[in-house]
């Protein structure tokens, strides 16, 4: 499952271990019990979520492949209860792939220049920076040094492996109007995948544990 984000980004589900019933099994092992019928299993998930018994959800694990601007990735990496591997600018020649916000992104802000000119200025700076990057590499400058001229809207790619408990914490903080708009878009994509793979857990999360706002306002 792959969802396109922004102008060139994406979130792709690479792997998932477990589902709603994984949390049920983990919770009932305390009483040396397993699965019951669907109604009672689903009720247990709601009970766990309502009363903050979150460790059973750590037995559901997702791996995502993400392509995002560096400034989004740096916010993302603050969520530390997870595993990350990122594209290396030391060992790889970085591609000309930059996030250019549309003029509509600036609607509602009191800028002294038109939004279209903002987009043009960003594009001009990106072009100059990337040309300089290539010139430095062609001059023999190592990639690890040449890359420092590139701006934060350069796209990077990384793998993110995270359990459902930490994923829900990510959604609480990033699927929220206080987060930057760009990372909100990625959080919505993560929520959509989470809902598809763990519908009972997602529904209980929204009902009892979600602290943000935008997931209750949009259809994921």
From Swiss-Prot:
Q: Give me the reactions it catalyses.
A: dUMP + (6R)-5,10-methylene-5,6,7,8-tetrahydrofolate + NADPH + H(+) = dTMP + (6S)-5,6,7,8-tetrahydrofolate + NADP(+)
Q: What is its EC number?
A: 2.1.1.148
Q: Which CDD domains match?
A: ThyX (cd20175)
Keywords of this entry = FAD, Flavoprotein, Methyltransferase, NADP, Nucleotide biosynthesis, Transferase
Per UniProt, what is one GO molecular function of this protein?
NADPH binding
| Gene3D superfamilies referenced in this protein's UniProt entry, alphabetically | 3.30.1360.170
Q: Which residues bind dUMP?
A: 75-78, 86-90, 147, 174
Where's the active site on this chain?
A: 174 (involved in ionization of n3 of dump, leading to its activation)
Cofactor: how and how many bound = Binds 4 FAD per tetramer. Each FAD binding site is formed by three monomers.
Q: Where does FAD bind?
A: 55, 78-80, 86, 163-165, 169
The UniProt entry, under InterPro entries, shows: Thymidylate_synthase_ThyX, Thymidylate_synthase_ThyX_sf
Q: Does the keyword Methyltransferase apply?
A: yes
Please explain the role this protein plays, according to its UniProt record: Catalyzes the reductive methylation of 2'-deoxyuridine-5'-monophosphate (dUMP) to 2'-deoxythymidine-5'-monophosphate (dTMP) while utilizing 5,10-methylenetetrahydrofolate (mTHF) as the methyl donor, and NADPH and FADH(2) as the reductant.
Q: Which family does it belong to?
A: Belongs to the thymidylate synthase ThyX family.
Q: How would you summarize the oligomeric state and partners of this protein?
A: Homotetramer.
What name does UniProt use for this protein? Flavin-dependent thymidylate synthase
